[in-house]
Amino acid sequence: MLFSKVIAPAFILLGAASAAPGGLAPENASKRDQPSVGDAFDKYNEAVRVFTQLSSAANCDWAACLSSLSASSAACIAAVGELGLDVPLDLACAATATSSATEACKGCLW
């Protein structure tokens, strides 16, 4: 029953779309209009470089900050696992993160 009502029409539609003249790509599209993987990688590297410059300009030591926030990791991992369904657990995560943030996070978080 499922094959005749869903799967067979899906295969017919797929066959008709792939047999369409010119395919489904717009006629005026060219390779030049599509971003390449190299361009995306260059943009990613530029974003990382800018982030690194900004964090170093703010005297942020990410390694020290993350190690100081490790005390709140258990509460926050549990809160993320609940996907926002347990509000008290979310509040506990926020409370432990703000209380365990030390001077190491001064340039990173505030």
Curated annotation (Swiss-Prot):
Binds 1 Ca(2+) ion per monomer. It is found in: Secreted, Extracellular space. Its cofactor is Ca(2+). Pfam families: CBP (PF12192). Disulfide bonds join C60-C108, C65-C105, C76-C93. Keywords: Calcium, Disulfide bond, Glycoprotein, Secreted, Signal. GO terms for cellular component: extracellular region. May be glycosylated. Induction: Most abundant protein released by H.capsulatum. Its production continues as the yeast multiplies inside host cells. The keyword Signal applies. Homodimer. Involved in calcium binding and uptake in yeast phase. Required for growth in limiting calcium conditions and for yeast survival in host macrophages. Is able to bind a variety of lipids. This is Calcium-binding protein. It comes from Ajellomyces capsulatus (strain G186AR / H82 / ATCC MYA-2454 / RMSCC 2432).
